[in-house]
Amino acid sequence: MAKSKFERTKPHINVGTIGHVDHGKTTLTAAITMVLAKKFGGEAKSYAQIDSAPEEKARGITINTSHVEYETEKRHYAHVDCPGHADYVKNMITGAAQMDGAILVVSAADGPMPQTREHILLARQVGVPYIIVYMNKADMVDDAELLELVEMEVRELLSKYNFPGDDTPIVIGSALKALEGDQSDIGEPSIYKLAAALDSYIPEPQRAVDGAFLMPVEDVFSISGRGTVVTGRVERGVIKVGEDIEIVGLKPTTKTVCTGVEMFRKLLDQGQAGDNVGVLLRGTKREEVERGQVLAKPGTITPHTKFTAEIYVLSKEEGGRHTPFFQGYRPQFYFRTTDVTGAIELPAGTEMVMPGDNVSVTVNLIAPIAMEEGLRFAIREGGRTVGAGVVAKIIE
């Protein structure tokens, strides 16, 4: 079959492999790129190429991640694979690689293991919306009943963490056999089956521009005779001249109207997701708006002070704290563009948190922040990043 030119016209989806160490995440990643490149074009990557993951920084945290891409019949996928467990934890908490869905790799020979559980929990906490399972190493299991047993265990585990275990696609195969070009059910055909499951089970994500307008406030100026201009990068949605806007966070929510949008000193009739713009606000005084607030479509986001979060605490080697912290620890939480002090409540039975740990906590901020589940933040002490987190559930 002739390789067609690599086209960007297909919808773009972000995925990644998760699962226990040595269950075959990287081998599967290599197999997917190789098998799909043969059929749909794109670049095959070897195990060694994927395994030598380069370092990258996200929110002041160094993470090793490999990025590959591949085509299926319907879509173009960007796929992340991490070499170590700590890299997965950091990746998922910082949102460095935002996933529209995850491929959970479980060894059919071993069944679910501690990190299988931890990655499913993390996926739930950080808002990975869909999981598909690849039961790997099926060539090492002769007993069909054992395969069924492992499949049942995986489904139960997914259901336990509020994923639809009974409806989750589970593909049985051997990534190694697929890499070797094996044509039996567990070889190459299992990769096509996985690709078809990705295409049908993970819905196309909403594009940023289709969301409700949101723009974090970076700077505020007053222009004599024109009013107050707020600058920032539009995170999602579109803002048009004449539309109502709410100013949310830090202070009581106020309403105003957008009377102008400018970009590179030119006036526009609208600004959209990704644009760095200045938004002119009617009748708003300069001191009524500050960095750390957001401009938003009315009624779409609310300010909160108390929430549960999944956090990762940097190790000493990563430039983090050298000592553990305890109940009532009060660092700054950096949301979007500003720091807000808050107190951390540890879960029952947890005395302290060591550098390098990840933990579920409850946070009480001293001032409200425009917040929704899945919002990322950094934890800082005097401007130095000591951790990262993601809002799991809003309390008040």
UniProtKB/Swiss-Prot annotation:
Region (G3): 81-84
Enzyme class of the recorded protein, top EC level: hydrolase
Residues reported to bind Mg(2+): 26
Location(s), subcellular: Cytoplasm
InterPro entries according to UniProt: EF-Tu_GTP-bd, EF-Tu_GTPase, EFTu-like_2, EFTU_2, G_TR_CS, P-loop_NTPase, Small_GTP-bd, T_Tr_GTP-bd_dom
Region G5, annotated ranges: 174-176
Highest taxon of the lineage: Bacteria
Enzyme Commission no: 3.6.5.3
PROSITE patterns (UniProt xref): G_TR_1 (PS00301), G_TR_2 (PS51722)
Keywords: Cytoplasm, Elongation factor, GTP-binding, Hydrolase, Magnesium, Metal-binding, Nucleotide-binding, Protein biosynthesis
Signal sequence, renumbered to the chain: none
Residue ranges of every copy of the tr-type G domain listed in the record: 10-206
Region (G1) residue spans: 19-26
UniProt xrefs under SUPFAM superfamilies: EF-Tu/eEF-1alpha/eIF2-gamma C-terminal domain, P-loop containing nucleoside triphosphate hydrolases, Translation proteins
Function: GTP hydrolase that promotes the GTP-dependent binding of aminoacyl-tRNA to the A-site of ribosomes during protein biosynthesis.
Record note on quaternary structure: Monomer.
PANTHER family, A to Z: ELONGATION FACTOR TU, MITOCHONDRIAL, ELONGATION FACTOR TU-RELATED
Protein name, UniProt field: Elongation factor Tu
UniProt lineage: Bacteria, Pseudomonadati, Pseudomonadota, Betaproteobacteria, Nitrosomonadales
Gene encoding the protein: tuf1
